[in-house]
């Protein structure tokens, strides 16, 4: 296993060298962790024992026609290119629906590559060659037309239960994925761990798939609520952003991660966000008003 990971990391460094040669100007390739490549080199040389964090970065692409920018967010799992690359394109000139379509097209294209093939450079080329049509479609959607039919979307809210959520890197991943996909909701850390994610169905399902990868076993979707909408779904949201929820804990033993979150506080939080009905679904016990 370690040999294959090392082989993957060597290929990742090779691809990063190619990217820096393609984008030599400062700021064009922005690493999430500026020490990421150094740590991987040390790991491959044997001077670092622990597996280094994954390479995460953003490349800002200048599209010539129309004159727009696309930020391509890239996460390289340790076993990439032998497992799927995580990519997401974002532009302030695209609405959520067109951004979703753009990323569907990009993901479909990357899915044609065989395991072991490097594909970041190919993804960049695909965006430069194909993104113009998505910006054009956005203009067409907003042109007045008596014949145009409203586009229906599915708004989804998922309630996810985990035995616990403690690790800093996992918590960071959950928040990063939530903000990257432009969903709203929260992540309650501790024991148990609860995640609520809401937004367009495609975004929520991608969030659910991404946070479970590669081996989060003690997690399940306890409840899902969906509704068809012809708008952007903003009026259906119960939350305004995606944030970490930190509550008081019972039996906090310092360095020990064996403590239970204050479910009474959590119930009050749910009431505030018109979600009291979910309490029984998550925990199998009926909610009781704090003033009764």
Swiss-Prot record:
- Specify one Pfam family: Prp3_C
InterPro entries assigned: Phi-like, Prp3_C, RWD_dom, UBQ-conjugating_enzyme/RWD
Disulfide bond annotation, renumbered to this chain:
none
Q: Where is the RWD domain?
A: 14-134
Can you say what this protein is called? RWD domain-containing protein 2A
């Amino acid at each position: 296993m370690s040999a294959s990971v090392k082989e993957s990391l060597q290929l990742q460094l090779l691809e990063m060298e190619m990217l820096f040669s393609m984008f030599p100007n400062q700021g064009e390739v922005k690493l999430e962790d500026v020490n990421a490549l150094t740590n991987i080199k040390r790991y491959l040389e044997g001077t670092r024992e622990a597996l280094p964090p994954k390479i995460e970065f953003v490349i800002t692409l200048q599209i010539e026609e129309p004159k727009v920018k696309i930020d391509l967010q890239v996460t390289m799992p340790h076993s990439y290119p032998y497992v799927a690359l995580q990519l997401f394109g974002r532009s302030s000139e695209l609405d959520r629906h067109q951004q979703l379509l753009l990323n569907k097209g990009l993901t479909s294209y990357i899915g044609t590559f065989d395991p072991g093939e490097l594909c970041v450079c190919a993804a960049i080329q695909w965006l430069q060659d194909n993104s113009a049509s998505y910006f054009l479609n956005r203009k067409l959607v907003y042109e007045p037309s008596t014949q145009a039919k409203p586009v229906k979307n599915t708004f989804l809210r998922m309630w996810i239960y985990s035995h616990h959520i403690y690790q800093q890197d996992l918590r960071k991943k959950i928040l990063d994925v939530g903000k990257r996909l432009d969903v709203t909701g929260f992540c309650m850390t501790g024991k148990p761990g609860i995640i609520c994610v809401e937004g367009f169905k495609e975004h929520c399902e991608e969030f659910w798939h991404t946070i479970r990868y590669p081996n989060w076993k003690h997690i399940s979707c306890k409840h899902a609520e969906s509704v068809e909408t012809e708008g952007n779904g903003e009026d259906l949201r119960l939350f305004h952003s995606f944030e970490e929820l930190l509550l008081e804990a019972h039996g906090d033993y310092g360095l020990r991660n064996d403590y239970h979150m204050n479910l009474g506080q959590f119930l009050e939080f749910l009431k505030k966000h018109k979600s009291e009905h979910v309490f029984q679904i998550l925990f199998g016990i009926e909610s009781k008003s704090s003033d009764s």
